Regions:
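Short alpha-helical DNA-recognition segment
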Residues: 45-63
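DNA major-groove recognition helix of helix-turn-helix/homeodomain DNA-binding modules
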Residues: 75-92
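Short basic helix-loop element that most often maps to the first helix and adjoining turn
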Residues: 33-50
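N-terminal flexible/basic segments that precede or flank functional cores
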Residues: 1-35, 99-117
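Short, solvent-exposed alpha-helical "recognition" segments
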Residues: 69-74
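Short polybasic/polar patches that bind polyanions
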Residues: 15, 42, 53, 83
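Glycine/charge-rich, flexible interdomain linkers and switch-proximal surface loops
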Residues: 54-56, 97-101
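DNA major-groove recognition helix of helix-turn-helix
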Residues: 66, 93
Length: 118
């Protein structure tokens, strides 16, 4: 029987996949924004056509967003989409702890915000 080798991850799936620190930070943020967008659309029970109308994009783009395809959508555009759907998006910048030269990127979503009817 063959034994599987398990390597502990770093906690950052994109770094573990070989992306650079900069690209990894971008992908973490984009994926969190995308998840919040997906949850908002799902929680409101909208069909893709209705979400497309509210976001002023075509249904095919909504389909890509709901399928998790981030390519072609900038962080700025995802933030704008969330705003159009009545979501507040906050960005906090603070100095990295002493001894760490490179800062980290974290994103949190508050599910309660996504559940506001609209």
């Amino acid at each position: 029987m063959t034994r599987a080798t398990v390597t502990k991850g770093s906690g950052n799936v994109f770094r573990d996949l070989g992306f650079s620190e900069e690209k990894s930070a971008e992908l973490i943020l984009k994926s969190s924004l995308l998840q919040a967008l997906q949850e908002t659309i799902k929680d409101r029970g909208w069909k893709q056509v209705e979400a497309a109308a509210r976001l002023s994009i075509d249904q095919a783009k909504v389909s890509k967003l709901l399928a998790g395809q981030m390519a072609g959508f900038s962080i700025e555009r995802l933030v704008n989409f969330l705003s159009l759907l009545g979501q507040d998006v906050e960005v906090t910048v603070r100095k990295a702890p002493r001894g760490r030269q490179i800062g980290t990127v974290r994103a949190r979503t508050t599910r309660k915000l996504a559940k506001i009817a609209g």
